[in-house]
């Protein structure tokens, strides 16, 4: 490949052309000026980036030495804490200072609700996520196990018995969230608007109204016979769709055909853990899809029922005000946030003046800023931010100095692009241990830019294992969620967010529900996230977003945060620093089960990543339950096995035997995939080798990250065709 030279950089032609012909036009930024700015940022900040990574390695080496020096002794938490302070891992906690982030959209500062994460390599998925601001509650109940499946309800076509259960459950939700003054929504025969109020007729013949008249927010159609009634609860809207001629509405006493929930309030467009972007072509695909979302032109064709359909961004939703005289406009799409790569990644899409790969996070920030201009300047028929902000999630930062570095990058990008100061907002992923223990300082370093903090249990566990690799054998993977450090970590995140005044300025978020087919379990368990004071939490699909929205109707998060603030902080640093090592002597069958579970999960994810470039997918686990896997789950599994190997719990021979046995299982699970390349019986493919590397070289991977091995092996697979 002949690269394009510009300002000392050597740029892949596909990226150079994308910036010149697609990204830069209509932004007011000349392509040459863009590359001049990028070159200056890389020259000035590249060395600082490398120095921060070197500090990570130096701190890890000191921690490893400390554990080795104290091997065989009872763990002394006070001595350990003092040591972490001495080496600069644990910094002094700053005085409380409230954040000052300005110009954030309501979806960040005011509205509480679900958050989707979507890989930017797939345009249709990205559009589905952006459009998941609204979702059918009837469809979500009908198509999932949120209502248990009765064998008698199976078959093609609509099953009325199941449909009746769906309608009953949906109306029970409405009774709880938007109750009537008397009676139930189940007994309604007509909704109408009289004198700016919702008038409700019951089958008894009696008239009633909403218990709280302010929950009526608008309508569509005629006041006497509306086609939609808009209700609101805890800041989230519900549209009751009325159509007496529809298949569902014709049998409903009030003609109700559906309930459309305001669902995915925000969506993370992912350039990081859920994508396999290893070269310039991959990066341009990610950037091009982002551009299409920022300028409103993205579309995707797909086949359904023998027809070709085109998906594009939904328009805003329009209703009449309750008095019928004005208009209520509601956002038709999720607020879009862009997740860039972390400081540790490098890309060959651009080489610096020494011919070395440049920090990928620097390139991502510059391109993200450029693409956001299309939204900020109004180049799109639909708006993302209404307040002049662009939202960038920054993952895998270790401690406050790295947060400061991110803010410095954003400052340079704003100056380069002529954007007002603090246009680029930052989401801090609290997924590395050094960020957790110094979270207050991290928040304050970004006090004018911060737009969210979010716990990421999966990556955080991977870092927990790697940081304390020398401390001893870790407990079994499935026991990790029950440990004291996990509860403290989750509570600490909310505590610090409330202390630093994030409400009104930034989201406080919780992690992913990883089982997209287990919606009944999600409904039972994920209520805990808003109850914990989180304003948002991650879901794996638009349907899951629709169902998780129910939890924000059950819990008034703003009121819950006020309760928690009055109660004071709940988490203790001492619990967070308690290392999850085990003194157990596990039975041989338990050890074998742990190895098999980890090996199967690693192979199931890695084989698609390496051979097909799929960075996030629903991978069947060892029990054939589909789980959403990305690099975070891979990090835990590979680090867990690396720890047990290093601590002598298991042998390389045991792991290799399991890998080969589990490869056969994974091959069978993928038998229906026409482009799948089996790993057995040769076990010599690039994907199988990558899985081996992740385990057997896991201890030497910086912070236990999987990206370096995955990227190298994916490039190898692409080169081999």
From Swiss-Prot:
UniProt: glyoxylate binding residues: 339, 431, 456-459
Main subcellular localisation: cytoplasm
Pathway assigned in UniProt: Carbohydrate metabolism; glyoxylate cycle; (S)-malate from isocitrate: step 2/2
Annotated GO CC locations: cytosol
Residues with the Cysteine sulfenic acid (-SOH) modification: 616
Cofactor: Mg(2+)
GO molecular function, one term: malate synthase activity
Localization, UniProt: Cytoplasm
UniProt keyword list: Cytoplasm, Glyoxylate bypass, Magnesium, Metal-binding, Oxidation, Transferase, Tricarboxylic acid cycle
The UniProt record lists the keyword Cytoplasm: yes
Active site: 339, 630
Function of the molecule: Involved in the glycolate utilization. Catalyzes the condensation and subsequent hydrolysis of acetyl-coenzyme A (acetyl-CoA) and glyoxylate to form malate and CoA.
Family note: Belongs to the malate synthase family. GlcB subfamily.
Name recorded for this polypeptide: Malate synthase G
């Amino acid at each position: 490949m002949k690269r394009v030279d510009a300002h000392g950089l050597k740029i892949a032609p596909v990226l150079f052309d994308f910036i010149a012909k697609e990204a830069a036009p209509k932004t007011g930024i000349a392509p040459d000026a863009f590359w001049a700015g990028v070159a200056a940022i890389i020259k000035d900040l590249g060395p600082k980036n490398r120095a921060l990574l070197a500090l990570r390695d130096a701190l890890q080496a000191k921690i490893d030495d400390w554990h080795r020096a104290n091997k065989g002794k009872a763990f002394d938490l006070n001595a350990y804490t003092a040591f972490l302070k001495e080496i600069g891992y644990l910094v002094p906690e700053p005085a409380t200072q409230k954040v000052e982030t300005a110009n954030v959209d309501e979806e960040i500062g005011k509205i509480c609700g679900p958050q989707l994460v979507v890989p930017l390599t797939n345009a249709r998925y990205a559009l589905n996520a952006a459009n998941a601001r609204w979702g059918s509650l009837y469809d979500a109940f009908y198509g999932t196990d949120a209502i248990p499946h009765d064998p008698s309800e199976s078959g093609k076509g609509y099953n009325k018995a199941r449909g009746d259960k769906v309608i009953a459950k949906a109306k029970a939700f409405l009774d709880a969230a938007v109750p009537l003054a008397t009676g139930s929504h189940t007994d309604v025969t007509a909704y109408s608007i009289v004198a700016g109020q919702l008038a409700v007729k019951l089958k008894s013949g009696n008239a009633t109204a909403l218990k709280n008249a302010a929950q009526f927010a608008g309508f569509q159609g005629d006041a006497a016979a509306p086609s939609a009634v808009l209700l609101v609860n805890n800041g989230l809207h519900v549209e009751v769709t009325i159509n007496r001629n529809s298949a569902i509405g014709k049998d409903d006493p009030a003609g109700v055909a559906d309930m459309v929930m305001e669902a995915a309030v925000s969506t993370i467009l992912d350039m990081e853990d859920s994508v396999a972007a290893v070269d310039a072509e991959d990066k341009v695909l990610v950037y091009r899809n982002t551009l299409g979302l920022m300028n409103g032109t993205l579309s995707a064709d797909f086949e359904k029922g023998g027809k070709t359909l085109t998906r594009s961004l939904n328009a805003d939703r329009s209703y009449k005000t309750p008095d019928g005289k004005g208009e209520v406009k509601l956002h038709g799409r999720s607020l879009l946030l862009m997740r860039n790569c972390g400081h540790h990644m490098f890309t060959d899409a651009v080489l610096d003046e020494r011919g070395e790969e440049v920090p990928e996070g620097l390139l991502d920030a510059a391109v993200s800023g450029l693409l956001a201009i299309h939204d900020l300047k109004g180049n799109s028929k639909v708006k993302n931010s209404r307040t002049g902000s662009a939202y960038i999630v920054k993952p895998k930062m270790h401690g406050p100095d790295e947060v400061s570095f991110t803010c410095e990058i954003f400052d340079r990008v704003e100056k380069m692009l002529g954007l007002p100061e603090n246009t680029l907002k930052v989401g801090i992923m609290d997924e590395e241990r050094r960020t957790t223990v110094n979270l207050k300082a991290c928040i304050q370093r970004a006090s004018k830019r911060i737009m969210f903090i979010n716990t990421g249990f999966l990556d955080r566990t991977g870092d927990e294992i790697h940081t304390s690799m020398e401390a001893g054998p870790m407990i079994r993977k499935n026991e990790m969620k029950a440990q004291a450090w996990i509860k403290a970590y989750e509570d600490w995140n909310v505590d610090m967010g409330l202390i630093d005044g994030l409400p009104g300025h930034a989201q406080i978020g919780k992690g992913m529900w990883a089982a997209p087919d287990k919606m009944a379990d999600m409904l039972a368990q994920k209520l805990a996230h808003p109850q914990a004071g989180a304003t948002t939490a991650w879901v794996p699909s638009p349907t899951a977003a629709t169902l998780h929205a129910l939890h924000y109707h059950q819990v008034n998060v703003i009121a819950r945060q006020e309760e928690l603030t009055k109660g004071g902080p709940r988490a203790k640093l001492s619990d967070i620093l308690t290392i999850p090592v085990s003194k157990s002597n596990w039975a041989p069958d338990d050890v074998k089960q742990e190895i098999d579970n980890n090996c199967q999960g690693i192979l199931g994810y890695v084989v698609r990543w390496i051979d097909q470039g799929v960075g996030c997918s629903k991978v069947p686990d060892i029990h054939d339950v589909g789980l959403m896997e990305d690099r975070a789950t891979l990090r835990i599994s590979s680090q867990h096995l690396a720890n047990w190997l290093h601590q002598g719990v298991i042998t390389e021979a045991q792991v290799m035997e399991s890998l080969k046995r589990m490869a056969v299982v994974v091959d069978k699970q993928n038998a229906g995939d026409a482009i799948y390349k089996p790993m057995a019986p040769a076990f010599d493919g690039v994907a199988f080798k990558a899985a081996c590397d992740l385990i057997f070289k896991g201890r030497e991977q910086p912070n236990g990250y999987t990206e370096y091995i995955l990227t190298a092996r994916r490039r190898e697979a692409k080169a081999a065709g």
